[in-house]
Amino acid sequence: KQWLEIGMLLAQDPKLLLVDEPAAGMTATEREKTTAMLVNAAKTRAVVVVEHDMEFVRRLECKVTVLHEGAVLAEGRLDHVTANQDVLDVYLGR
């Protein structure tokens, strides 16, 4: 279902593609194909992915922005963001 929705969006040739949890409920193989599709789409347009699966995000190899209560908490490479103490405090409930 997600592929159909992403495909319908790409058919409209948008300058910005916003996808929410595109890998939800997918098998490992489907997640790999979705990663490739989004990486390819990002070559010709801006792609914003809202995702909680950090392994999926890691495979995208892109800049990550962590939001908390509507404000940017951290931004940068995934390894930088996941090592950020503010991010750890917020998401581990400290």
Spans of features found by a protein language model:
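Glycine-rich phosphate-binding loops of nucleotide-dependent enzymes
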Residues: 1-94
